[in-house]
Design a protein with these regions (language model features):
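Phosphate/dinucleotide-binding and metal-coordinating scaffold of catalytic cores
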Residues: 1-238, 242-245, 255-338
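Conserved protein-kinase catalytic-loop position immediately C-terminal to the HRD catalytic Asp
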Residues: 251-253
Length: 338
């Protein structure tokens, strides 16, 4: 693609969240430029991320706010991300290949962990080493590490919060209840409390957020053709209600897909705002999918009847083992009595 003229030649499958056209029409080409810049920009952290400025400064990147400026940043590390295997080669003559850039196999920077997780002011020479941390979304401090050839995400917490305990406990509770959830374990990195979770993407497993999918596709149509995905959606609404998760926006529930691009519902993730919901808390996914504004409890009661959950062991759980056990117990009982 030519970012100046908008000319595009499509040689293979594109990301779900990128739409461009092979066209000589002026408006189509303007749209191509806008869309590719938006896609590139989506692979750059937001400035509200804790230590975002330290991360950008370490790589000598500008503190960009516009899609144009973010695109210039993303292109410096070829738009690499651990979300998928898409990347950008700037020129045909450029001496780079997927083999030389593949984040799933290459080394990570120990310095980036100190910058991304603790805000230590350091400098990074190889911008590709910053790609995993520069492209990770969310506000909480986080950093990628490699242990025994496995990738893990360390996720800290904002000052004064209890996010690490909340995320680890919500994950443990939901797994005990039988939900398909990312495992977050409490750990300590250089004296800093954090959760640790294994990377769930790979060279053959990509992710697309619901927000990204809905940029170009109709999610209700997807649910009609794949009812098993809608059932998983209902399970998510129940899970978020049970642990009082207030941060389930359309950017942090996901679909996974392999090389065949067959979509499946991703494991539930991101629980650092668990146990914060109150009676009036709204369910944002319902609003995104069904265009209805309902409370988290109303959505859960509706979804509970459609989720196909095995609740046989729910009443036998010893809630005293959990710091937030009583909170969840009350919500479990309300659903079981519905």
């Amino acid at each position: 693609m030519n970012l100046k003229t908008g000319e595009v030649k499509i040689h293979g499958t594109l990301p779900f969240d990128l739409y461009v056209e092979e066209s000589d029409d002026f408006d189509d080409r303007i749209n191509n430029i806008t869309n590719i810049r938006h896609w590139c920009a989506s692979r750059v952290l937001s400035l509200d991320r804790m230590y975002a400025k330290e991360i950008l400064n370490a790589c000598n990147f500008t503190q960009a706010a516009t899609d144009y400026d973010k695109t210039q940043i993303a292109l410096q590390y070829h738009c690499l991300s651990l979300r998928d295997c898409y990347w950008i080669k700037m020129e045909k003559s450029e001496n780079q290949s997927w083999k030389t850039l593949n984040l799933f196999h290459h080394s990570l920077s120990d310095a980036m962990v100190d910058i991304s997780l603790k805000g230590v002011p350091l400098t990074i020479q190889q911008t590709e080493l910053a790609a995993p941390d520069c492209s990770s979304q969310g506000v909480a401090p986080k950093a990628w590490i490699r242990e025994k050839n496995m990738l893990y995400l360390l996720k800290g917490e904002l000052p004064g919060s209890d996010a690490v305990r909340k995320e680890a406990e919500a994950s443990a509770i939901l797994r005990e209840l039988g939900f398909d959830v990312i495992s977050y374990e409490k750990t300590v990195y250089d004296g800093l409390s954090a959760t640790k979770s294994a990377c769930y993407t790979s060279e053959h497993c990509n992710l697309i957020s619901a927000a990204g999918y809905m940029e170009n596709e109709d999610i209700q149509e997807l649910f009609q053709t794949k009812p098993e995905l809608e059932q998983k959606f209902h399970q998510m609404n129940v899970a978020d209600y049970l642990v009082g998760n207030t941060d389930r926006h359309w950017g942090n529930w996901e679909f996974w897909y392999d090389d065949d691009r067959e979509l499946r519902f991703g494991k539930l993730m991101d629980f650092n705002h668990a146990f914060e919901a109150v009676q009036e808390t709204k369910n944002l996914p319902y609003q995104s999918v069904y265009r209805r504004i309902v409370s988290q409890e109303e959505a859960a009661l509706e979804s509970f009847a459609k989720a196909g959950l095995d609740t046989a062991g729910w009443e036998k759980i010893d809630w005293t083992r959990y710091w937030y056990g009583e909170y969840v117990k009350e919500r479990v009982e309300k659903l079981l009595q519905s």
